[in-house]
């Protein structure tokens, strides 16, 4: 723009400001009047048209004060050139803007003896006198309210109404609306009053037609009485024969059915519904047995749950599981286990840890939830104890020294706490127990991978973590172990050649004497497990 020639500047100004439909300079001109443009305008101002000169002079009023101060000399030169112009309007606007670059105010002290101003005012008075005086309002009328405008300009004459639309009164409109609403309501009542029933349940509103015979009952087969003879039925058994039905014909009207026929019609539907209900129960039953509810707790951990869940848990008896085992020093922790190619001689197999099926007397006393799973592996108990042969006497687990465990005799000492432990647990009063946020997260993480722990065992673990120190099996000692999960792992051998598949049991150990709990792993070789 700085290198623009004078002719280019003049053509550019004519394109921007040469429109005759708008005689005022728009505010957007302020962004176009830069310092370079003002310098070029000063050189080509005398060649511009009168309309462009007027808009350019009026556009300087939109410039910011900082821009006016920067371009004061150029603006004063342009205004000085405008005072020498031949157009009277350009001369008058230049006289008004004479003091604007210096003081920022307009020069309104125009001399009355100035012939140019006198000529322009005379032309304006002639133009105003030609117009009707009542239509002329001051420029500030749009900023004044009615009272202030009346005080300034006097009473305003109302506009003359040359014609007026003929409209119905409001009462007539309301009367027509009420009449239409009453007509619609009467039609709806008349339509609903003639419908005594739905024909065949099709949803069609029809009136009862009493002139035509009913098509549901054929004329050729009337109702038979007990005295009417029948060729196809024995004489001693005379019952009314239901009317024959034509399934392909669309029946209308009222159909009379015998009670026996109603039973036969609904029997198939009832049988189908009952069969569907049985199928859904069969599908849902195994899923319910496999699902372990982790949120429910028994009575001795009732403080861990909300009062809404407590009502459903009070009716369930709390029994210790068969996997409570006293701690023994023969447990190998997960961190200290060194796998070797030799087979350990001590641990029995999983088949040997199951209770024998020969003594059938103690099995009816056990709950069903403990019959379905085998007791946890315990390497510390002696499986050769012959004492549990009598089912009536309570058994006490003993560990005699110098006895080598064998895989043929199963350990049955796990069944001993089942006969006498539940009674004192149910009689003890409830305590308000609560878990911290960290304990809740730890329990959730622990139960997420637990595939062997039962619902009572989970409740016992949560109660111990919350602060319960009531030992459900005092006969087994202060330390109780609960089997959480069971899985297999491939561990490398000690010599580094190959790997051995081990059966890993994750065990949760609770010490009721110290209040501490730990979690560790037990390893068993897969060669001993069939």
From Swiss-Prot:
GO terms for cellular component: cytosol; NELF complex; nuclear body; nucleus. Residues 225-238 have a biased composition (Polar residues). The modification Phosphoserine is found at residues 225, 233, 363. Transmembrane segments: none annotated. Residues 213-248, 266-296, 312-409 are annotated as: Disordered. Residues 89-248 form the HDAg domain. It is found in: Nucleus. Signal peptide: none annotated. The modification Phosphothreonine is found at residues 157, 277. One of its GO terms (biological process) is negative regulation of transcription elongation by RNA polymerase II. InterPro entries: HDAG_dom, NELF-A_domain, NELF-A_N. Residues 125-188 are annotated as: NELF-C/D-binding. GO terms for molecular function: chromatin binding; molecular adaptor activity. Pfam families: NELF-A_N (PF23553). The keyword NADP does not apply. Residues 277-291 have a biased composition (Basic and acidic residues). Its main location: nucleus. Residues 315-341 have a biased composition (Low complexity). Belongs to the NELF-A family. Essential component of the NELF complex, a complex that negatively regulates the elongation of transcription by RNA polymerase II. The NELF complex, which acts via an association with the DSIF complex and causes transcriptional pausing, is counteracted by the P-TEFb kinase complex. The NELF complex is composed of NELFA, NELFB, NELFCD and NELFE; NELFA and NELFCD form a stable subcomplex that binds to the N-terminus of NELFB. In vitro, the NELFA:NELFCD subcomplex binds to ssDNA and ssRNA in a sequence- and structure-dependent manner. Interacts with the RNA polymerase II complex when it is not phosphorylated by P-TEFb. Interacts with NELFB. The HDAg-like domain is essential for transcriptional repression, and mediates the interaction with the RNA polymerase II complex. This is Negative elongation factor A.
